[in-house]
Amino acid sequence: MESLFPAPFWEVLYGSHFQGNLSLLNETVPHHLLLNASHSAFLPLGLKVTIVGLYLAVCIGGLLGNCLVMYVILRHTKMKTATNIYIFNLALADTLVLLTLPFQGTDILLGFWPFGNALCKTVIAIDYYNMFTSTFTLTAMSVDRYVAICHPIRALDVRTSSKAQAVNVAIWALASVVGVPVAIMGSAQVEDEEIECLVEIPAPQDYWGPVFAICIFLFSFIIPVLIISVCYSLMIRRLRGVRLLSGSREKDRNLRRITRLVLVVVAVFVGCWTPVQVFVLVQGLGVQPGSETAVAILRFCTALGYVNSCLNPILYAFLDENFKACFRKFCCASALHREMQVSDRVRSIAKDVGLGCKTSETVPRPA
């Protein structure tokens, strides 16, 4: 079994279960089209190692970046704005899913799931939670930007950090509508003499599979993207229609800067997720990736979804002056702390050497 991310509706369009979070396992198509441990010819070892290496690089870089983002927001009071509260939620979801990459990478290399039932359920649930919390959070950020740009008076009451926190809680609650059931249905089972981490679709599978697939596709991607598109269309019309959104040029620049940041984050998200969504639609039309090239492309498109989780901190550093200043302050403080530690260590060694020299000078030589 080789678990894939991030489209759990891939297999359920056709069959009884999927493995991990995205799989080609399917009981209704010819067996030679299936992607599992018994068909490792689809992916050579070198390609598997390349994909797993990409996973590990994304995992390490993404964890460092997202943890730094969360630290900066928690550490600095001025960073606790409504937009940054949503960014914190996005970083939290990305951090959780990045923690699953070592397990999924091991699964890809070995061709089976070696971590047991409990961890299988956990990884599956985190994949789904990340999928929904990310899209819902980006949607909330876009609506938040729309209110700030198009309804500045109402924004004074609506756009508060406490209300943003409440929205984040609601986002996780909504994601639980899918996350909890798939965690219950997920299990490590023996399939084709290999242990696989999979989700069993309830019977009748011919009915619930497509229903589940369509709902996931609509609510995790299409509807959020449509809402985001409407919000930004209205914002662009507003921004073109007025020279100043507020009475202050400085405040106006900040509004436009933050709006641009959110737009870029959304655009990168859609760009990273669209390829695998296209694969899902292609399979939905009955086309199965039956060649090594098709499977390899699918793997890298899946990895691209993970790459998105480590790109956001980089975007914040380049596009937001406040994040850039906080990141620079953190890095400089860390470097200064290391220099002080080295300096203290050098002084301590010098002191010890000096005491040793004094002692040797005062000890009388034997006659």
From Swiss-Prot:
GO terms for cellular component: cytoplasmic vesicle; plasma membrane; synaptic membrane. In the brain, isoform KOR3 and isoform KOR3C are most abundant in hypothalamus and periaqueductal gray. Isoform KOR3A is highly expressed in cortex, striatum and brainstem. Isoform KOR3D is highly expressed in cerebellum, hypothalamus and brainstem. Detected in spleen lymphocytes. Disulfide bonds join C120-C197. InterPro entries: GPCR_Rhodpsn (IPR000276), GPCR_Rhodpsn_7TM (IPR017452), Opioid_rcpt (IPR001418), X_opioid_rcpt (IPR001420). Gene3D superfamilies: Rhodopsin 7-helix transmembrane proteins. The record marks D107, D127 as: Important for G protein-mediated signaling. Keywords: Behavior, Cell membrane, Cytoplasmic vesicle, Disulfide bond, G-protein coupled receptor, Glycoprotein, Lipoprotein, Membrane, Palmitate, Phosphoprotein, Receptor, Transducer, Transmembrane, Transmembrane helix. Pfam families: 7tm_1. The keyword Cell membrane applies. Phosphorylation at Ser-360 requires GRK3. The keyword DNA damage does not apply. Residues 72-84, 144-162, 234-261, 320-367 are cytoplasmic. Glycans are attached at N21, N26, N36. The chain crosses the membrane at residues 46-71, 85-106, 122-143, 163-185, 209-233, 262-282, 298-319. It is a multi-pass membrane protein. Disruption phenotype: Mutant mice do not show altered basal nociception, but are no longer susceptible to modulation of nociception by the neuropeptide nociceptin. Contrary to wild-type, they do not show reduced locomotion in response to the neuropeptide nociceptin. In addition, mutant mice show subtle hearing defects. A lipid is attached at C331 (S-palmitoyl cysteine). One of its GO terms (molecular function) is G protein-coupled receptor activity. G-protein coupled opioid receptor that functions as a receptor for the endogenous neuropeptide nociceptin. Ligand binding causes a conformation change that triggers signaling via guanine nucleotide-binding proteins (G proteins) and modulates the activity of down-stream effectors. Signaling via G proteins mediates inhibition of adenylate cyclase activity and calcium channel activity. Arrestins modulate signaling via G proteins and mediate the activation of alternative signaling pathways that lead to the activation of MAP kinases. Belongs to the G-protein coupled receptor 1 family. This is Nociceptin receptor. It comes from Mus musculus.
